[in-house]
């Protein structure tokens, strides 16, 4: 069991200038170990955490040594424990987390223990930002109208979260309409350095959203984890992680005139994807750092999941301190942060000579080489230089269906869909823009690109250009500060004139909450099989995510979103072709509306002020009248309503006893689905709209829910019945068992029937037959969606055999008791001749002590084939989870024993 901290003699006082002390801290220099000076800054944060939390039980002295010896130990894939300083949630992932906590309290109660042991031990911040939809756009009243609809749809969920904020200690809930979680985290919640009862330590955070990495731009170590892992971290469990390699990314030079931070991040994303950084930290350094504003850094850090890294880390320097002052942190706080980080060798001062850090590998980018670009049409790392966009688009129309292809026959490529839009003649072609959204924390946190977009709108208005009325335009800032500086600059009216009215403060289009297109537009697209485009300043553009009818989705900077909205198509060469005709009848080109870097800098300087941040965040937890009027039950145990279609008691702990179920293999399982590469968590557990013919729709209709009130899958994650039916329900699912047919169906192997995935799974379960899933590379990439593991578990899936897994998803599968297995290098289902019509036996020992992390096992089929796979339990702790039937039963049993 836990002992006292062996490093207590390293506890040192941090003096205040002018007398007194800021507090005590665990001093890295007092260890007198020269290896620490060579460590990357990101690894120093892990080291400090290990020293501070060392109790020779959860965190051992040898763990500290592994981190100090990072240079030698990181290539060996060693495991370390990490205890983050706090946990961050948003409402889509927060609702199921609070449901699980409430359910764990019930389980503790039933097992005769104290249910109040289930309480967050670290600060938990939950920001409600994922529920607002763009129902109303292009209207002065859009914010209010969308918020009223948001509350009508989500009243029950919001009341449940409000109950949670009262029932659990240490939990702050930021009400709807306040902003996007990662931007609120950057501008307000991020501490950089904690001072808890006189103990100083670096802020660090894990969040149930993959873009938690945005906070890395502020020098705070943070990354996305599954909801299941986050719940364990809240309850004081150390997170088990492999000590990561760190890629050193050197930046030099400065961005050319007219090039944006978004162009830079799309370039960095492509470079890092190519380099291969999955499971690694990326740490930025070099002279170019001084040219990047903190918002630019946050934009790059935000997209870590898109380049595949665990973190994209920017150590704290003078730029960070300036930003902390700008965003209203007090002078006293900023001086404590600087003093602590300097004293503990965690501050970078570019005015001083830099000691060489050691990195696992190195990359370099001269900022002057970055050129304007966008990414798409289906993946964030498929970057296209702006000057090549037209030719790339035509290649995409020609290419066979794939990440860069739509397979439109040559004779159909010039088709025009003519229709009437509210009485006025309108037309759509392949590439016509039907959604243009300035959205997402990635970019709305960055004043230079937001004000850049407003300047494009202003120039367009002055020249007489106008966005066509059938383009669904929207602006959804990540915090109220954006509204304040857009108004202060006098530029918001120009955005309004082009249809970019503010529609709400939340994720909106970036996560698929784009709302309906006008019926006439939808019909024109569907009836004529048009490949319509969405252009958004988001961070993800996977198929079917932004809107079911936009097959081409491009990520672009906010000013480019406005430019493409004005052009009305992505089928344009901005260098050579005019965007439109001005009021004088002359052609207007891209160069005529594009602002210079100097113009943007001037407006940023005069419009973005510290008071805006102070006044916005002083009132953030006060909520709004609709939030304040929500009535919630009191009591620390939740009263489940069996008729609720939003909040339902899940079955995870139904028959739980104090005895773990133990390890087990899989015998004679059928294949539920057979996939190729790049199956995302969006494919496994979609967040967007509930299709009218889906099993989830049938369930809701049977319970008296109108179609208009279905809401989204994301909003119903507190109901396991809906979510089990929504598992593998993505309309773009490609399952090899269906021989080329696209859609959320599968073949029930014993009968050969074609059924919905849910119906097939139920059939297997009622016959007592286990199932597995076959997959290709990058299985589970995308959002850190714990329902992508919970759902398959509820469907009876016992194992997933893939070429490779995305980091968060693999740990989520383990957390739910599903076995992740990898084919051997160079092998996959196709090369082994597996069709998915076989039965599979996985030969795993029944005794957990006989299983090692990463060991090989034999898989045999009833057709006589046998092959070797690697079991992806990566750590001893993960084996303990598996033995217990998952991470949450493990935590409950441990808490009862304490």
Curated annotation (Swiss-Prot):
Pfam families to which the protein is assigned, alphabetical: Aconitase (PF00330), Aconitase_C (PF00694)
Designated name of the protein: Aconitate hydratase, cytoplasmic
Compartments it resides in: Cytoplasm
Lineage: Eukaryota, Viridiplantae, Streptophyta, Embryophyta, Tracheophyta
GO cellular component, one term: cytoplasm
SUPFAM superfamilies: Aconitase iron-sulfur domain, LeuD/IlvD-like
EC number: 4.2.1.3
Entry GO MF terms: 4 iron, 4 sulfur cluster binding; aconitate hydratase activity; metal ion binding
UniProt record similarity statement: Belongs to the aconitase/IPM isomerase family.
Record field: catalytic activity: citrate = D-threo-isocitrate
Keywords: 4Fe-4S, Cytoplasm, Glyoxylate bypass, Iron, Iron-sulfur, Lyase, Metal-binding
Swiss-Prot/TrEMBL GO biological process terms: glyoxylate cycle
């Amino acid at each position: 069991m836990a002992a006292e901290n062996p490093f207590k003699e390293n506890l040192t006082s941090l003096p205040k200038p002018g007398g007194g002390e800021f507090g005590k801290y665990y001093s890295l220099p007092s260890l007198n170990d020269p290896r620490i000076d060579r460590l990357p800054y990101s690894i120093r944060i892990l080291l400090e955490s290990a020293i501070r939390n060392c109790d020779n039980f959860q965190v051992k002295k040898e763990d500290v040594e592994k981190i100090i010896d990072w240079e030698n130990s990181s290539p060996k894939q060693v495991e370390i424990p990490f205890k983050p300083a706090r946990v961050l949630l948003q409402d889509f992932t927060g609702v199921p987390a609070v449901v699980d906590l409430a359910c764990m309290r019930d389980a503790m109660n039933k097992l005769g223990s104290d249910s109040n042991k289930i309480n967050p031990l670290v600060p938990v911040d939950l920001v409600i930002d994922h529920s607002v939809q763009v129902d109303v756009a292009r209207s002065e009243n859009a914010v209010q109208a969308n918020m009223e609809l948001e509350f009508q749809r989500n009243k029950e969920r919001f009341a449940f979260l409000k109950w949670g904020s009262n029932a659990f200690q240490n939990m702050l809930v930021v009400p709807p309409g306040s902003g996007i979680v990662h931007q609120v985290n950057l501008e307000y919640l991020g501490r950089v350095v904690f001072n808890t009862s006189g103990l100083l330590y670096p802020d660090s955070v894990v969040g149930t959203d993959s873009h938690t990495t945005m906070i890395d731009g502020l020098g705070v170590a943070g990354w996305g984890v599954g909801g299941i892992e986050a719940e364990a971290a809240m309850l004081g469990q150390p997170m088990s992680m492999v000590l990561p390699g760190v890629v050193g990314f050197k930046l030099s030079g400065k961005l050319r005139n007219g090039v944006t931070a978004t162009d830079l991040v799309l370039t960095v994303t492509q470079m890092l994807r190519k380099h291969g950084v999955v499971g690694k930290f990326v740490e930025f350094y070099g002279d170019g750092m001084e040219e990047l504003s903190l918002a630019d850094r946050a934009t790059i850090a935000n997209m870590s999941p898109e380049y595949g890294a665990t973190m994209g880390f920017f150590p704290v320097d003078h730029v960070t301190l300036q930003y902390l002052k700008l965003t209203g942190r007090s002078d006293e706080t900023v001086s404590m942060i600087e003093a602590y980080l300097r004293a503990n060798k965690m501050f970078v001062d570019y005015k001083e000579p830099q000691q060489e850090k050691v990195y696992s590998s190195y990359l370099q980018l001269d900022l002057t080489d970055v050129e304007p670009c966008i990414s798409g049409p289906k993946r964030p790392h498929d970057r296209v230089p702006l000057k090549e966009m037209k030719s790339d688009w035509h290649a995409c129309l020609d290419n066979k269906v794939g990440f860069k292809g739509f397979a439109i026959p040559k004779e159909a490529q010039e088709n025009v869909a003519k229709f009437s839009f509210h009485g006025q003649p309108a037309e759509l072609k392949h590439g016509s823009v039907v959604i243009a959204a300035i959205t997402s924390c990635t970019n709305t946190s960055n004043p230079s690109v937001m004000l850049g977009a407003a300047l494009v709108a202003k120039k367009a208005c002055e020249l007489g250009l106008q966005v066509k009325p059938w383009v669904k335009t929207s602006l959804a800032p990540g915090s109220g500060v954006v509204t304040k500086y857009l108004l202060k600059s006098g530029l918001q009216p120009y955005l309004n004139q082009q249809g970019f009215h503010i529609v709400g403060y939340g994720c909106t289009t970036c996560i698929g909450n784009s709302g309906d297109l006008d019926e006439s537009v939808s019909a024109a697209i569907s009836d004529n099989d048009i490949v319509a485009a969405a252009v958004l300043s988001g961070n993800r553009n996977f198929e079917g995510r932004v809107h079911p009818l936009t097959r081409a989705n491009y990520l672009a900077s906010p000013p480019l979103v406005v430019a493409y909205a004005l052009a009305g198509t992505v089928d344009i060469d901005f260098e050579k072709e005019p965007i439109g005709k001005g009021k004088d009848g002359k052609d207007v080109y891209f160069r005529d509306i594009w602002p210079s870097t100097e113009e943007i800098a001037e407006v940023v300087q005069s419009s973005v002020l510290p008071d805006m941040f102070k006044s916005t965040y002083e009132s953030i937890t006060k909520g709004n009248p609709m939030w304040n009027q929500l009535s919630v039950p009191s009591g620390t145990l939740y009263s489940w309503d069996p008729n609720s279609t939003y909040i339902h008691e899940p079955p995870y702990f139904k028959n739980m006893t104090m005895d773990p179920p133990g390890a087990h293999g899989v015998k004679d399982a059928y294949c539920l689905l057979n996939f190729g590469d790049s199956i995302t968590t969006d494919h496994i557990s979609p967040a967007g709209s509930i299709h009218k013919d889906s099993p989830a729709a049938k369930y809701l209709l049977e319970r008296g829910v109108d179609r208009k009130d279905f809401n989204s899958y994301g909003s119903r994650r507190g109901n396991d019945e809906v979510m089990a039916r929504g598992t593998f329900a993505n309309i773009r699912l490609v399952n090899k068992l269906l021989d080329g047919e696209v859609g959320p169906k599968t073949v029930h192997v014993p009968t050969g029937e074609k059924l919905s995935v849910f119906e097939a799974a139920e059939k297997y379960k009622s016959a007592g037959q286990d199932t597995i899933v076959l997959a290709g590379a990058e299985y589970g990439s995308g959002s850190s969606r714990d329902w992508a593991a919970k759902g398959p578990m509820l469907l009876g899936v016992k194992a997933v055999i893939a070429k490779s897994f995305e980091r968060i998803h693999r740990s989520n599968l383990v957390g739910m008791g599903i076995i992740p297995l990898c084919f051997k290098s160079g092998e996959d289902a196709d090369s082994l001749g597996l069709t998915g019509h076989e039965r599979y036996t996985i030969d795993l020992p029944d005794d957990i002590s006989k299983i090692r992390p990463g060991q090989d096992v034999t898989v045999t089929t009833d057709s006589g084939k046998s092959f070797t796979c690697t079991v992806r339990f990566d750590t001893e702790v993960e084996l303990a989870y598996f033995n217990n039937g998952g991470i949450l039963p493990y935590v409950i049993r441990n808490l009862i024993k304490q």
